Design a protein with these regions (language model features):
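Conserved beta-hairpin
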Residues: 16-35
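Conserved acyl-donor/pantetheine-binding loop and adjacent beta-alpha core of acyl/acetyltransferases
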Residues: 34-68
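Conserved acetyl-CoA-binding loop-helix of GNAT-fold acetyltransferases
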Residues: 65-82, 99-104
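Short, P/G- and charge-enriched loop/turn segments at secondary-structure junctions
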Residues: 7-9, 45-52, 110-111
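Conserved catalytic-core motifs of GNAT/GCN5-like acyltransferases
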Residues: 90, 106-122
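Active-site beta-strand termini and strand-to-loop segments that position acidic
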Residues: 23-25, 125-129
Length: 130
């Protein structure tokens, strides 16, 4: 969206081994996301709430997909839930589609975090075990 993530950011994700592709039935890349173990520096401070626990976690960032391709978030979640760890994710307040998808998978709203650029994001956590 608006040039983010940039090519440089994607190259850094790949170099760290954190980048994942979602492929369609024909093998074409239809989506992209980052999945990596925490701690994530932007999740160190949370405001107007608290994380569910201090358990080890993985973060999901930069979910992007081709327009009009459905099921990308479902594929991301199949991959991430296989890690059997707590998951943390954040999104912009105005990203209603992502907020709906996050709620669909029973993530719990935990509070507000700020990105490295200082932008506010809604932060969520899904505990691996209740």
């Amino acid at each position: 969206v608006n040039g983010y993530p940039s090519r440089d950011v994607i190259c850094q994700d790949i170099a760290r081994g954190d980048a994942w592709l979602v492929t369609g039935d024909n093998g074409d890349a239809v989506g992209y996301f980052v999945f990596r173990p925490g701690p994530d520096p932007t999740y160190r401070h949370i405001y107007h709430g608290a994380w569910l626990n201090d358990a080890p976690y993985h973060v999901i960032h930069r979910i992007a997909g081709r327009p009009h391709v459905h099921g990308i978030f479902d594929a991301v979640m199949r991959h991430c839930q296989a890690a059997q760890t707590d998951l943390r994710i954040d999104t912009h307040r105005d990203n209603h589609i992502m907020r709906h998808l996050i709620a669909k998978y029973a993530f719990i709203y935990c509070g507000i975090i700020h990105t490295e650029m200082g932008d506010e994001r809604l932060a969520y956590q899904l505990a691996a075990t209740p």
